[in-house]
């Protein structure tokens, strides 16, 4: 299978042996608007991206808590146009989202705040340039309509492999994660 591992930040991408979402798709930083989505670069770079998108089987995205709604919708739109099965959600590419939504939130600048606001209208249609109800990935049109299967991992591995870390420390981390003291 042709698998691409992506992350929101460069450091996380290095840690998982992948690339940033922006680098792989050629997105500019900032708000992703449908009216501005296009493959950028030289003609050769653009064709290389098209070939890469058409050959994809799966994408794994780490740090899902930082993945904004506009960015996930942009990934879906590009793959629907240039993926292996145009017109299908994510162009027929299997998408795996990983991470803890209680970790770091999506980053929204002051200039981008107006794009993320509560909406009372029909949420079953893409809204794009009209905004999203929140910056969280799960409020993207692509996620709400993508049929994602949610799994909750409950066993902690990282702290259990370190003999110096006790159960009290692991419980303390869990309380912090949930905003309890």
Task: Label every PLM stretch briefly.
Residues 1-181:
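Conserved ATP-binding/catalytic motifs of P-loop helicase motor domains
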